[in-house]
Regions:
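Glycine-rich, basic loop-to-helix element that forms the pyrophosphate-binding segment
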Residues: 90-106
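Short, acidic, metal-binding catalytic loop of nucleotide-sugar glycosyltransferases
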Residues: 48-53, 72-85
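Acidic donor-diphosphate engagement hotspot in glycosyltransferases and nucleotidyltransferases
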Residues: 99, 125-129
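A conserved hydrophobic helix/loop-capping motif in glycosyltransferases and polysaccharide synthases
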Residues: 51-52, 56-66, 147
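Short beta-strand-to-loop acidic/aromatic patch adjacent to the donor-nucleotide binding site
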Residues: 111-122
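Conserved catalytic core of nucleotide-sugar-dependent glycosyltransferases
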Residues: 130-233
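Short, acidic/glycine-rich phosphate-metal binding loop used to engage nucleotide
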Residues: 64, 88-95, 151
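C-terminal catalytic/acceptor-binding lobe
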Residues: 2-51, 212, 217-219, 239-304
């Protein structure tokens, strides 16, 4: 691996905000950073399986197949189903690539449905309930299955692609030193497209901060995919995203391609992934995948 590539990755994966800022300072424009993302190697990935019913195969990316979260998935949450754990960790972990690797492997079982889930699921409805809900669907006319919003899933089912207004940019510049740095980076890479939840967008104040471009269904830690739909895709997620916005971009693709999405009633809750950290650090590290997200939409890769 080139020494510069390794050094840049150390800065990007650092837990020190100043290091992450130095990482962004290295690049003059979005194209340079995107090239770094494309050249970034993948962490090793290894498959571990738990045998079970193969009509629904569950694919779970995890840092430790023998850890507390993974064991809970195998022994409780998805007990009785064929489970494919994709173990991958370290500084070059890439969520999108781990998911793609596991989904491709799951095809060997020729399942009707493939569940893609995070490993930090805390509780879920009985698998028999999930199966009964899926039986009700028109299989041939259902590409994607999402879960109905509930108390255990309080986030928005609908997402909104927005164009940020100058008022929001100005607000960030006066909202404290961290937000000023954050907005400075967004200005540097011309990041004015983003995705927010519909409930947040519907707030009165948001009307002055964002211009709505398109509303679409989003998914977060759990999605069910028809195997016939998966056969039409070379890769489920775009592997160039680095642990962020790959789900938003795919959700946007579903909308653009008019994919058939069904919503079922099934309870599930999770801790919530923090691959990029939380708070200010998370916002800083999400800039990289947001740069790629903006690039794809602005350069004719996808229609707005």
């Amino acid at each position: 691996m080139p020494e510069e590539l390794d050094e840049l990755n150390k800065l990007f994966t650092s837990k020190n905000a100043e290091d992450v800022i130095k990482f962004y300072d290295h690049f003059d424009n979005a194209e340079q950073l995107i090239q770094w993302m494309k050249n970034r190697p993948s962490a090793p990935m290894k498959i571990y399986e738990v045998g079970g019913d193969k009509d629904i195969v569950v694919v779970i990316p995890t840092a430790n197949h023998d850890g507390e979260y993974a064991k809970n998935c195998a022994d409780n949450i998805f007990k009785g189903q064929q489970i494919v754990f994709v173990e991958s960790n370290g500084p070059f972990f890439n969520y999108a690539r781990s998911c793609n690797f596991g989904l491709k492997y799951a095809f060997k079982y020729k399942p009707k449905w493939i569940v893609l889930s995070n490993d930090d699921v805390e509780k879920a409805g009985d698998m028999s309930k999930l199966k009964s809900e899926l039986v009700k669907l028109d299989y041939k006319n259902t590409d994607i299955v999402l879960l109905k919003n509930s108390e255990s899933r309080p986030y928005d089912l609908s997402s909104v692609l927005v164009y940020e207004t100058l008022l929001l940019h100005a607000y960030r510049k006066f909202a404290g030193s961290e937000m000023r740095v954050y907005q400075k980076l967004r200005d540097k890479f011309t990041l004015n497209l983003d995705v927010i939840g519909k409930r947040r967008f519907d707030k009165f104040s948001s009307k002055f901060l964002y211009n709505k471009i398109r509303e679409f269904y989003g998914f977060f830690d759990f999605i069910i995919v028809n195997d016939e739909y998966l056969k039409t895709k070379h890769q489920f997620f775009d592997p160039n995203f680095v642990n962020g916005y790959e789900d938003h971009f795919l959700s946007y693709e579903f909308s653009e391609q008019h994919r058939h999405i069904s919503i079922i009633d099934f309870e599930i809750s999770s801790v919530g992934g923090y691959t990029l950290g939380s708070g200010y650090m998370r916002r800083l590290k999400e800039i990289a995948p947001l740069i790629y997200f903006n690039y794809l939409l602005k350069n004719g890769e996808r229609k707005l």
